[in-house]
C-alpha cells in the first residue's frame, strides 16, 4: 500500500509499505529516500507520536494515510569559548533604572528619550 509522509518544509514523500511494517522499517525507508537518520526522525499520525516497535496496523494507518515527519530537537553543551562569548554579549550590560533599557557595559547615560537620557544606571544582575 502507499502512504505519504509530509515534512515541516511542506515536501511530501511517497512510500510503499505493508500494514505489517514496523515504524522502524518506515523510518529506514525515509532514510533511504531523504538521508535523515532514523534516530532523528519523529513520526506523528492522528496527533500521536509513533513508537518504533509498533506496526502501521497498530495505529490503524491505511492506504494513502499521511504521516507527519518532524526532527528531534538537538541539545547539548556549548563549547566553553562560545559560552563565554554568549555570556559577555547577553550579561555584561548596564540597565537604565527608569526605563529598563539594556545598554552597553561602558554606558554613562541612557539612549532612550522617554527617560530623558538619565545617568541613573546599574549593572545587569548576574545569573545564579
From Swiss-Prot:
Pfam families per UniProt: Ribosomal_L40e, ubiquitin
Top-level lineage group: Eukaryota
Protein name in the entry: Ubiquitin-ribosomal protein eL40 fusion protein
Record keywords: Cytoplasm, Isopeptide bond, Nucleus, Ribonucleoprotein, Ribosomal protein, Ubl conjugation
A GO molecular function held by the record: protein tag activity
Cross-link Glycyl lysine isopeptide (Lys-Gly) (interchain with G-Cter in ubiquitin): where in chain: 48
Site (described: Essential for function): 68
Single GO biological process annotation from the record: protein modification process
Record PROSITE patterns: UBIQUITIN_1, UBIQUITIN_2
Organism: Drosophila melanogaster
Domain Ubiquitin-like intervals: 1-76
Designated gene of the protein: RpL40
InterPro entries the UniProt entry points to: Ribosomal_eL40_dom, Ribosomal_eL40_sf, Ubiquitin-like_dom, Ubiquitin-like_domsf, Ubiquitin_CS, Ubiquitin_dom, Ubiquitin_ubiquitin-like
A single cellular component GO annotation: nucleus
Further comment found in the protein's record: In Drosophila ubiquitin is encoded by 3 different genes. RpL40 and RpS27A genes code for a single copy of ubiquitin fused to the ribosomal proteins eL40 and eS31, respectively. Ubi-p63E gene codes for a polyubiquitin precursor with 10 exact head to tail repeats. For a better understanding, features related to ubiquitin are only indicated for the first chain.
Site (Interacts with activating enzyme): 54, 72
Family according to the record: In the N-terminal section; belongs to the ubiquitin family.
Location of cross-link Glycyl lysine isopeptide (Gly-Lys) (interchain with K-? in acceptor proteins): 76
